[in-house]
């Protein structure tokens, strides 16, 4: 049980700094333009389903199947827009189920990571590297970063309410 002083300080901080929405990103794929064409057909474009908190990024209507040595996972959401390099972000549980030893990495840090087969409606590809378990991170706009006094790559602590807090 927290003291009234601690609760008062927490309330003041919330009022001063504001709260940051927290979410969990499920498994997803970022595709290069070349791989999008192979998987969905020449000239294919991603169809936005839901805009994400990061400006200009979205969850696409399109999904793929990812296939590892042990099993496959269907209906994996693609995030857009297209990227320079294809990457697959999964959970530790997914990695175990797929039979892949994926490292915890920052998004885009793909050197030396395992590959995977990606299957779409028009074709399939096998990437030699690009499967990661995403390092915990926070997306926030510049105004929020300034308000919290943080910059890109800073390490922060986050407190959340809930039954597992």
Regions flagged by a language model, labelled:
Residues 1-17:
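Short, low-complexity, charged amphipathic interaction modules
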Residues 21-69, 74-121, 126-159:
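Short beta-strand-centered segments at strand-helix junctions
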Residues 163-165:
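Short, intrinsically disordered, charge-balanced linker/junction segments flanking boundaries
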